Amino acid sequence: MELKVTTLEGKEAGSVQLSDAIFGLEPRQDIVQRCVIWQLAKRQAGTHKAKGRAEIWRTGKKMYKQKGTGGARHGSQRVPQFRGGGRAFGPVVRSHAIDLPKKVRALALRHALSAKAKGGGLIVIDKAELEAAKTKALVGAFSGLGLTNALIIDGAEVNNGFATAARNIPNIDVLPVQGINVYDIVRRRKLVLTKAALDALEARFK
């Protein structure tokens, strides 16, 4: 698959040949979905907690005698039916992470990249660099490229000026190539790769 390369100013800068093994797969939503669920489950903090009846600080003495009061038969005051009692089957601190094999994760990334390429949501630029970290200038460049909701992937290191200018623009994410992931690709309308990022991805999946 051949794709045009443009500059940030919207000028043509040649073309690039995309690998069919990375960008030419028939997208499978089930594999992509598995990876997204894995990512979102892994990022959950799992710090929610409610005290059970064994953790409530309250006397364990029987409330009143068993018979003769006309009231129901109660023992401990820590039980869930009383105000201030322990929660029955409440949430506990735990990890929400699930297992997903590395090969499936790598396959999901290739399917997400292929889906963007097939749907016309992939743009290749020569480099993502700015001389001055000015958000206004970058907004103008993005407007010329038609980018309002995009994930931009640079090489191993992101240009400081570019990252600083982009961080205040809504719906624009900038990541180094080692940070590329399925969830961020799926949640943004456009995927923008620099030539350095493209070379790194092809070396990674070689």
From Swiss-Prot:
Gene Ontology biological-process entries: translation
What cellular component terms from Gene Ontology apply here? Answer: ribonucleoprotein complex; ribosome
Which key words tag this protein in UniProt? Ribonucleoprotein, Ribosomal protein, RNA-binding, rRNA-binding
Per its UniProt entry, which superkingdom is the organism in?
A: Bacteria
Keyword RNA-binding in the entry? The reply is yes
Q: Which InterPro entries match?
A: Ribosomal_uL4, Ribosomal_uL4-like, Ribosomal_uL4_dom_sf
The UniProt entry, under SUPFAM superfamilies, shows:
Ribosomal protein L4
Return the similarity comment: Belongs to the universal ribosomal protein uL4 family.
- PANTHER family for this protein: 50S RIBOSOMAL PROTEIN L4, LARGE RIBOSOMAL SUBUNIT PROTEIN UL4M
Q: How does it assemble?
A: Part of the 50S ribosomal subunit.
The protein's job, in short, is:
One of the primary rRNA binding proteins, this protein initially binds near the 5'-end of the 23S rRNA. It is important during the early stages of 50S assembly. It makes multiple contacts with different domains of the 23S rRNA in the assembled 50S subunit and ribosome.
List the protein's name. Large ribosomal subunit protein uL4
Q: What is the lineage of its organism?
A: Bacteria, Pseudomonadati, Pseudomonadota, Alphaproteobacteria, Hyphomicrobiales
